[in-house]
Amino acid sequence: NHDFTTSNLAAIDQSNSTPTNNFCKINSLVNQGLAAFNVRQGGTQVLTGGNMSHVGTMGLTAGKWYWEGVQTSVTGTNYVGIGVAAVDADQGNSADSLGNSFTGWWTADNAYHETTSQSAQNVSYNTGWTGMSAGTVWSVALNCDTNPYQMTIRKNNRSVGTYIGNTKAVVPLIRVYANSSGDTYHNFGCPHVSALAGGNADANGYGNFKYAPPSGYYAICTKNLAQYGGDG
């Protein structure tokens, strides 16, 4: 008989996502780029061999949103892109068109890039920042209530710049360079790695983040989207 006793199950392995309040996760149906695509841990962990963009399952058109991520291990040249992609960006597994058109910070040249079309981008400005290393926690605070939207990216809770975007309907994105591989974890409120579990919820009490979300910013989940996400 089964006595329903849990075994080898840590608190970090339990999800805050419920049938009445689903959190954003990595979209396993978007097989984007040239690399193998392996989504684990409830859509929060992605194993890649490189040249791959990962996007979230929930689109954003209004509201203020916060999410985090970390690479716990890296081999090879470690370039990552952190930001958002337009919901109508080109997709395909023969080239990383999502990564070629995202808006955000690209550590290969430490510059902010801005989408110009469904498959292209331009360098908006050079930042002078340093790149990313294993264990570095990044976070994004996205304000879709401004027109155009405003996005602030932080590294280990220190701001690395604020950028004004030129599109309104977006999904969260991270891009991994072709010559690197490793474990990438995303935290939209349900962390499955202790590096992203700091016990910080948003103002509505949703989510578990490494760092406290900025005032007025919320976890990407269905209850918050219903309250702040506009008409979609």
Segment roles from a protein language model:
Residues 1-232:
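PRY/SPRY (B30.2) beta-sandwich protein-interaction domains
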